[in-house]
């Protein structure tokens, strides 16, 4: 696109009594164009004055400032500019080599501007020294320009009310006599020499090589060059396609494309276009009423006069549907002048101020003029609404009038039928009430007579026995009903927890975070607990939200590898949660604590076991909780270890409920811990369950290497940047924790490293889901253990979601392998934990059931199954031959585009 189009249906600035929005004029909407494709930009409709862009040119779409408010916007070839709300200076973005990103230079210090206009490769701004006045003094105006062959300061005699830009030229409109003047390159268009003298305009709109203006009588006048390459184009509205041959309709405003122009009719605010358009171009929608329009080189966009305020485009190569709501005009601080009314959003009078900032500003739109021949004016235009025309059914001359009158007649018939129906329903209701009343009176009379009748002793005895039998049966049912009640978290008093922790003394403190402290306590019944006490913060609302989030989730979730919540306390500003006490602290303390013996105690088998158990807990959150739960703070310090060295996932303060479809993204502000935070979530605010997968991948790298997620004592402080190249190079030995001796066979650890590498991929759709991660880790654990006869904490098929640990398999007890009876006795001494059922979860699913959906994996991998009689002797080799299968799972591409553009 070679032309800069912007038009709005409202008063641009405080001192603009009429419009001058041309191709490159400033308004609430603008379009850029060029080799990289078209882009539509507009001010948001929520009154924030923030700009949003949508289109093909990434430099304009992603370069748009997301937190800077603007008065209005304009655009050119590969760039867009806006007038800053705070400083009244222009700010540009995009990829144009002549108009740089930021505030254009050179810039006069302290200069303020009231109007912008952008051409193909230049930008001009109308300077003002006093806010609200265009001229430096009463007789002169200053216009600064930047860009290709246009960088200069122009001093014009006379006050200028508006400016508009074409491809290589600029035009302005004098405020006093409403005449037009132009400057720039004359060689291509001839616009400067052909500019009319002593012709008064309400507004002007420059196109590529022509200018159109609305005269004081609302007629349109155009001058300049028309397209002569007729073999490449087809006329849109006139016989010869000449842009200078204009329609006779009265117009509110006009805009210009490269070789075409469009205007808004005063009568009905519908769009009329004329001039040349390319082949296969879409026409303007018939009957479309708009608030504002803006033209590109070969297309035009408009803001429909609907409550949605979602723009639509027509022509060639432009975006046809735009999924964003924009402001229909620029806000002004003065009251609306004669011929304008105040815009009220959603049809509510006075609510138009919500689309403007500050609150005392408003958005003014021009009134429609007159009514069609078959209509009459039922109410005139006033300060709060446009004029209203009603069809005269006795003078119908259009299809719309005929259709309206027929619908009105049908409406009257329906109203009459509805009235008759109400009468009929009332009669039926009266009859029903009468019958019911008679029946009730009869029943009461019969009951009264029965109570006062004389019954025999046998009948009384029979009735008594029947009543006793019923009560007895009812007593039997009652205990079963009580058994169905679900246990909830217990509520403790603050005094009870204060006594249990010794007054929350430092001696009982076992951990401290940014928002809470954890104390060890002993309840009156001797139960050892961990009490999490929230640190009193200034943001009480946020602290209370995190407290109730964690309380709500933990009281409903039920899994062996999630931290068990025993109770809570909320007393004034005090908020406390009571958990099971984890005797061995956190995984972080073992891997990175000051005591080196803790690190040595975690041999490779225990480390991988902890990883498998934590993965199962996260898999439960993603796959079996309904709706799914996204933890958002998976890290080694939030994986706790109990007295049996089983892992528990803890700290649900940042957790949120995900959508029922786990692949659907959420738009959330980033929350979590640096080093573990998903890069895609951090940059794009694109949150899915794959964000937890990334954090868990970092934890796997910690388990393998013994290094912190971020450790600045190393040259490469980020563990992902350090570990991933080693894994891809196959140098696993350099990755492993030097504190532990590497196992004789590194194959299992190589598989775990490969899983971690896939988990920390930059794009979420390339990461595996947690069920696939868990399956791969279970296989790696089995391969690491080498044989089912070796004492192992948990085998891949021995854990059921919802129970802590299972007894060893019966087949293992009767195995022909050399397993001693003492080993079996020790293995049977396991702690079984029972939890209340969870009403937010699906039924528990075993790891073997999880893999039933991928039946015959051995056949797909080219492996053969051994005979059942040889299982005891060959299961170790069978487990070693298993290969992990992790395929990426990602949301659909259209969802990604929808949530980011």
From Swiss-Prot:
Region span, 7 X 36 AA repeats: 31-328
GO MF assignments: ATP binding; protein homodimerization activity; protein kinase activity; protein serine kinase activity; protein serine/threonine kinase activity
Classification via SUPFAM superfamilies: Protein kinase-like (PK-like), RCC1/BLIP-II
Composition-biased stretches (Polar residues): 889-901
Domain Protein kinase: 504-781
Transmembrane segments: 423-443
Keyword presence, Metal-binding: no
Location of the protein in the cell: Cell membrane; Endosome, Multivesicular body membrane
Effect of inactivating the gene: Abnormal epidermis cells walls with discontinuous cuticles, leading to irregular architecture and organ self-fusion resulting in distorted interlocking structures of the palea and lemma which accumulates abnormal levels of anthocyanin after heading. Delayed separation of the palea and lemma at later spikelet stages. Severe interruption of pistil pollination and damage to the development of embryo and endosperm, with defects in aleurone and reduced seed fertility. Reduced stature due to shorter primary and lateral tillers.
Catalytic activity: L-seryl-[protein] + ATP = O-phospho-L-seryl-[protein] + ADP + H(+); L-threonyl-[protein] + ATP = O-phospho-L-threonyl-[protein] + ADP + H(+)
Class of this enzyme: transferase
Signal peptide: 1-22
Chain positions covered by the region annotation Disordered: 845-901
Family matches, as Gene3D superfamilies: Phosphorylase Kinase, domain 1, Regulator of chromosome condensation 1/beta-lactamase-inhibitor protein II, Transferase(Phosphotransferase) domain 1
UniProt-annotated catalytic positions: 633
Species of origin: Oryza sativa subsp. japonica (Rice)
Designated name of the protein: Serine/threonine-protein kinase-like protein CR4
Annotated glycan sites: 149, 177, 280, 382
Induction line: Regulated by GRF10 and GRF6 at the transcription level in floral organs during floret development.
Topology versus the membrane: Single-pass type I membrane protein
Subunit structure: Homodimer.
């Amino acid at each position: 696109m070679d032309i800069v189009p912007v038009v709005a249906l409202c008063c641009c600035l405080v001192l603009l009594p009429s419009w001058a929005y041309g191709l490159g004029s400033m308004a609430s909407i603008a379009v850029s164009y060029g080799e990289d494709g078209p882009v539509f930009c507009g001010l948001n409709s929520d009154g924030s004055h923030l700009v949003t862009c949508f289109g093909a040119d990434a430099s304009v779409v992603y370069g748009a400032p997301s937190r800077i408010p603007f008065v209005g916007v304009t655009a050119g070839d590969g760039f867009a500019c806006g007038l800053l709300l705070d400083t009244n200076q222009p700010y540009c973005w995009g990829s144009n080599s002549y108009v740089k990103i930021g505030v254009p230079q050179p810039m006069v210090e302290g200069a303020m501007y009231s109007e912008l206009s952008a051409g193909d490769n230049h930008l001009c701004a109308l300077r003002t020294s006093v806010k609200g006045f265009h001229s430096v003094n009463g007789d002169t105006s200053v216009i600064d320009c930047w860009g290709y062959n246009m960088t200069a300061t122009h001093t014009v005699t006379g006050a200028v009310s508006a400016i508009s830009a074409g491809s290589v030229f600029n035009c302005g409109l004098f405020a006093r006599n409403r005449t037009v003047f132009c400057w720039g390159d004359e060689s291509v268009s001839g616009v400067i020499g052909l500019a009319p003298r002593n012709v008064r305009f309400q507004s002007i709109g420059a196109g590529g090589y022509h200018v159109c203006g609305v005269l004081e009588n609302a007629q349109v006048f155009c001058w300049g060059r028309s397209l002569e390459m007729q073999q490449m184009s087809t006329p849109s509205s006139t016989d010869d396609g000449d842009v200078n041959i204009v329609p006779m309709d009265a117009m509110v405003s006009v805009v210009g494309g490269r070789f075409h122009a469009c205007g808004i009719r005063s009568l009905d605010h519908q769009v009329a276009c004329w001039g040349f358009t390319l082949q296969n171009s879409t026409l303007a929608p018939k009957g479309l009423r708009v608030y504002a329009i803006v033209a590109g080189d070969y297309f035009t966009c408009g803001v429909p006069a609907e409550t949605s305020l979602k723009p639509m485009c027509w022509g060639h190569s432009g975006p046809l549907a735009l999924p964003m709501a924009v402001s229909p005009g620029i806000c002004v601080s003065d009251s609306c002048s004669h011929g304008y009314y105040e815009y009220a959003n959603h049809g509510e009078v006075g609510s138009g101020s919500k689309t403007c900032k500050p609150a005392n500003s408003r958005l003014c739109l021009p009134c429609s003029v007159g009514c069609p021949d078959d209509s009459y004016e039922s109410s005139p235009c006033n300060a709060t609404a446009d004029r209203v025309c009603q069809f005269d059914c006795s003078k119908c001359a259009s299809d719309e009038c005929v259709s309206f009158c027929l619908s009105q007649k049908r409406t009257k018939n329906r109203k009459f039928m509805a009235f008759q129906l109400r009468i009929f329903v009332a009669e039926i209701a009266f009859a029903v009430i009468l019958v019911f009343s008679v029946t009730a009176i009869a029943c009461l009379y019969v009951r009264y007579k029965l109570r006062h009748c004389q019954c025999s002793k046998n009948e009384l005895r029979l009735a008594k026995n029947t009543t006793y039998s019923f009560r007895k049966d009812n007593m039997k049912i009652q205990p079963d009903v009580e058994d169905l009640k679900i246990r909830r978290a217990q509520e403790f008093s603050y005094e009870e927890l204060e006594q249990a922790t010794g007054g929350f003394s430092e001696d009982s403190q076992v951990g401290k975070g940014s928002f809470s402290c954890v104390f060890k306590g002993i309840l009156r019944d001797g139960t050892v607990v961990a009490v999490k006490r929230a640190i009193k913060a200034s943001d009480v609302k946020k602290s209370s939200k995190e407290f109730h989030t964690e309380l709500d989730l933990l009281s409903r979730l039920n899994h062996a590898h999630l931290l068990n919540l025993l109770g809570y306390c909320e007393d004034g500003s005090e908020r406390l949660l009571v958990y099971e006490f984890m005797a061995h602290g956190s995984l972080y303390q073992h891997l990175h604590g000051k005591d080196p013996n803790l690190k040595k105690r975690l041999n490779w088998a225990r480390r991988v076991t902890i990883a498998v158990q934590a993965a199962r807990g996260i898999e439960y959150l993603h796959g079996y909780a309904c709706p799914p739960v996204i933890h958002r703070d998976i890290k080694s310090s939030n994986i706790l270890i109990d007295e049996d060295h089983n892992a528990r996932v803890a700290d649900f303060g940042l957790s949120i409920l995900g959508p029922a479809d786990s692949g659907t993204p959420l738009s959330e502000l980033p929350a979590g811990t640096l080093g573990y935070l998903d890069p895609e979530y951090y940059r794009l605010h694109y949150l899915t369950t794959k964000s937890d997968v990334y954090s868990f991948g970092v934890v796997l790298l910690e388990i393998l290497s013994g290094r912190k997620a971020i450790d600045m004592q190393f040259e490469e402080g980020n563990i992902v940047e350090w570990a991933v190249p080693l894994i891809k190079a196959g140098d696993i030995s350099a990755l492993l924790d030097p504190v532990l001796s590497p196992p004789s066979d590194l194959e299992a650890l190589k598989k775990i490293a490969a899983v971690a590498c896939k988990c920390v991929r930059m794009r979420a759709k390339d990461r595996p889901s947690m069920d696939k991660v868990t399956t791969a880790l279970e296989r790696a654990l089995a391969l690491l253990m080498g044989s089912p006869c070796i004492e192992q904490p948990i085998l891949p098929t021995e854990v059921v979601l919802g129970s802590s640990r299972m007894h060893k398999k019966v087949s293992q007890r009767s195995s022909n392998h050399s397993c001693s009876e003492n080993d079996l006795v020790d293995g049977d001494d396991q702690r079984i934990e029972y939890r209340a059922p969870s009403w937010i979860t699906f039924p528990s699913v075993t790891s073997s059931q999880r893999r039933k959906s991928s039946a015959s994996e051995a056949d797909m991998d080219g492996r053969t199954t051994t005979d059942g009689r040889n299982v005891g002797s060959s299961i170790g080799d069978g487990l070693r031959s298993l290969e992990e299968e992790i395929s990426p799972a990602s949301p659909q591409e259209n969802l990604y585009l929808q949530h980011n553009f």
